[in-house]
Amino acid sequence: MSTTEIEKVVKGASYSALLLNDCGLPITAANIAALFKTAKLNGHETTFKTFEDFLKTNPITNYIGAIGGSAPAAASSAPAKKEEPKKEEPKKEEPKEEETDMDMGDLFG
């Protein structure tokens, strides 16, 4: 078996494990083999058993979502603040002085 064939089997087993987990089925060598048979892929029972044994001690849910969680380098580390619409406060009306008709002459008596 060449390296590319081994890589295909490992990828297929990985995808099978993800699919079985997503469907809520146990990740066993028999279930992985059934998926390979359905997809008309060639694989070895030892590879399927290796995946089953590994995933018994290391649940696949530990690896889901753990990849690529970092932010781009250009992004700031602080979360962006949401701008809330400013509430306009009602303007207080200043008391108006009563307007009187005054002439300049009334000022001096």
UniProtKB/Swiss-Prot annotation:
Q: Where is the signal peptide?
A: none
Task: Give this protein's Gene Ontology molecular function annotations.
Answer: protein kinase activator activity; ribonucleoprotein complex binding; structural constituent of ribosome
Task: Spell out the residue ranges making up region: Disordered.
Answer: 71-109
The stretches annotated as sequence repeats are 81-85, 86-90, 91-95
Q: How is it modified after translation?
A: Not phosphorylated.
What keywords is this UniProt entry annotated with?
Answer: Repeat, Ribonucleoprotein, Ribosomal protein
Record's keyword annotation contains Amino-acid biosynthesis: no
Q: Is Repeat among this UniProt entry's keywords?
A: yes
Q: What is this protein called?
A: Large ribosomal subunit protein P1
**High-level lineage:** Eukaryota, Sar, Alveolata, Ciliophora, Intramacronucleata
Q: Gene name?
A: RPLP1
